[in-house]
Amino acid sequence: MELNWEFDRYLASIYRSSGYLHCIEEIEFIDFKEFVGLEKEIALLCQNTQSFLSNKECVNVLLWGARGCGKSSLIKALLGKYAKEGLRVLQILKQDLQKIPEIFDYLRNKPYKFIIFCDDLSFDRDEKEYKVLKTFLEGSIEAFPKNILIYATSNRRHLLQQFHDENEIFGFEGDEDKIALSDRFPLCIGFYSYGHKEYLEVLAQCFKKSNIYDEFAHIQQKAINYATQKGSKSPRIAKQFFKLYQSGLIDIL
C-alpha cells in the first residue's frame, strides 16, 4: 500500500479500500455557532483538540448517541477551526480498520497533527474489525503516535451489539469484550435527542442564515408535522425540512 497526501493543499482525506487516500477538494465547513444546545460537548472537544495541537495530554474520543444530532458535523467544525494550526483529518471506514497500522506508519513522523475519523462506528456479533481497533487504541507493543488521535462516532455507547453466547461464562466474557473497546476511549461524550424547542431553534437559524426569517413563523407547524412524520426532531431533520422548503417541495408533501 502506497499512500500520498499533499498536506499543504488538502486538509482532509478519505482512505479508500483499494489502498489509496482520496484527498478532499471541497469541504462543507460548519461554524460552532450553528450548533444548538451543545456548549458542553463543544467545549470538551475543543479543549482536547487544543491540548493535542499544543503537545499536551490529550485522549481519543468517542461521540455516541442519538442519530442526526451533530456528532459528525462537529468533526468538520473542528477542522475548520484548527486547520491553520496544522490539524488534518483522515476518515476511515469500518471495513478498512485493518489498515490502521499502515496508516499510522505513514503519518507517524509527518509535521502535522491528525485526527483519524471513524464515523458511525458499531459492530455486530460476527464482525471482528473491532479487535484491530481495540489493539491499536491500547494494547500494541508500539507506542501510539503522538501526532494522531482517533475520534469516533456511534449510535451505540459500547460500540458492540449486546449478546450472550451459551459458551460464555454467565455471559460475562461477551460483556467484557464489548465494554473493553469503549473503555479505550477515555473521553466519551453523549448526545441526546432534541426536543421541540431545540428543533425549531435549529430551523430558525437556517431561515436567518438565508435572510428569510420573516417566513419562519408561518412554516413552524409544517416543520413540526414533518418531524413527526420522520420520527425525529434532530438537527438533521430540521435541515432536511429547510431544503424541502427552499425547493418548494414542502408545499406538495
PLM regions: where:
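Walker A/P-loop nucleotide-binding motif
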Residues: 55-75
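Conserved catalytic/switch belt of AAA+ P-loop NTPases
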Residues: 125-166
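AAA+/P-loop NTPase substrate/partner-engagement loops
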Residues: 81-114, 121-126
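A short, basic N-terminal segment
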Residues: 1-51, 235, 239-253
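A conserved segment at the C-terminal end of the G1
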Residues: 76-80
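C-terminal alpha-helical "lid" subdomain
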Residues: 2-9, 192-253
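Conserved AAA+ ATPase "SRH/arginine-finger" region at the nucleotide-binding site
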Residues: 169-179, 186-200
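Conserved nucleotide-binding/hydrolysis micro-motifs of P-loop NTPases
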Residues: 95-98, 121-124, 150, 154-160, ...
